[in-house]
């Protein structure tokens, strides 16, 4: 199975979700000076920011990470977290990334997710990678 790459702000909601998920994952650093480059296909797990619009929905460190053509080329899907208080903007970062990068938006969960979200993502990620061609 390929990896997960995620971003978590200082609130650590996404970090806690990843810890509960128990799958291999690499964190996009908060520090602008730190960069990572992936070397295998991955699914991105990202929180949504902003108060409802498209602008600002994707965290800046995630934009920097995806602006690296190598990292962007290995992206295979996106999972978004959000806050349902933002209505239609819930999980907006997933929609923005899926559209701009041409990958499927696989799932969304609220804040740090429920046990059901953990189980759904764990199962969904496993099944997603099983359906992918070996050289994808």
Curated annotation (Swiss-Prot):
Q: Which superkingdom is the protein from?
A: Bacteria
- UniProt xrefs under InterPro entries: Flavoprotein-like_sf, RNR_Ib_NrdI_bac, RNR_NrdI
Q: List the disulfide bonds.
A: none
Which biological process terms from the Gene Ontology are attached to this UniProt entry?
protein modification process
**Which molecular function terms from Gene Ontology are attached?**
FMN binding
Q: Which Pfam families match?
A: Flavodoxin_NdrI
What the record says about family reads: Belongs to the NrdI family.
This molecule's function is given as:
Probably involved in ribonucleotide reductase function.
**What is the protein name stated in its UniProt record?**
Protein NrdI
Q: Which organism is it from?
A: Escherichia coli O127:H6 (strain E2348/69 / EPEC)
Q: What is the lineage of its organism?
A: Bacteria, Pseudomonadati, Pseudomonadota, Gammaproteobacteria, Enterobacterales
């Amino acid at each position: 199975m390929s990896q997960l790459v995620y971003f978590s702000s200082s609130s650590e909601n996404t970090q806690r979700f990843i810890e509960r998920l128990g799958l291999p994952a690499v964190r996009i650093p908060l520090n602008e000076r730190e960069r990572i480059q992936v070397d295998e296909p991955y699914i991105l797990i990202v929180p949504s920011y902003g108060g409802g619009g498209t602008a600002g929905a994707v965290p800046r460190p995630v934009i920097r990470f995806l602006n690296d053509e190598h990292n962007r080329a290995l992206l295979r899907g996106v999972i978004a977290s959000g806050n349902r208080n933002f209505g239609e903007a819930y999980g907006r970062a997933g929609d923005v990334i899926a559209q701009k990068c041409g990958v499927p938006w696989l799932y969304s969960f609220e804040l740090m997710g429920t046990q059901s979200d953990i189980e759904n993502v764990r199962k969904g990620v496993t099944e997603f990678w099983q359906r992918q061609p070996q050289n994808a």
